[in-house]
Amino acid sequence: EFPKFVKAAVKDGLLDKRMADGRFDLKKLAAELDPARDDLSKYLGVVTNKNRYALRRQNGSPIETPQFTHMRIAMGLSYNETDPTAAAIEFYNHMSNLEYVPGGSTRVNAGGSFPQLSNCFLLNVDDDMESIAKAVRDTMWIAKGTGGIGIGFTKLRAAGSPVKTTNTESTGPIPFMKMIDTALFAVSRKGKKAGAAAIYVENWHLNFDQFVDLRQNSGDPYLRTRFANTAVFISDEFMKRVEKDQD
């Protein structure tokens, strides 16, 4: 069944074409599958694999057994090896015996048509519109691939600061953080592992008090985030003043 599964999934665009282009001996890989290893996982692990990581049809129904998932990931990590089949078998044995468990993005995407394998990304937003727009775009693409993102917003000028090019005042970083939050919601991958983000600001920023309220349930919804988390860079000066009980 495994060779048929791979070829059908490639034809339907669910798997990368390299999975069935001849570099793998699919019959040999199928012979290595050991359904008894399903019992090594606890019930919660099996359900989590089904709900978050298993390949699905367009109607949302899973089409992979746990061992199919392990082998699909193993193949997706072995495209460029000297002997892809042997490498995939070695990866499979380690994963199916729970000796090695790859990160979530690798489990979701390896072997698939959108093979983004990294879990974590860092972005730093500069104080200009091009950088802000690029951060929103990058957030959407990374979230599509289930990546987690840390985004630094400290460089953005505070609300009320002059904007020379338009002869107006800046709205500050908070509304742009809301744009990141909305982008995460728009690319939420309902039913599977979703992307995530944490927005970072250093404690000396003039809008720091507004920033720490971002996750509050009450208040102006345009100044709140529901999906993006918040994190703070604490300076040495801040901690020195805490020790001395100073403002």
List PLM regions with ranges.
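Extended catalytic cores of very large enzyme megasubunits
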Residues: 1-247
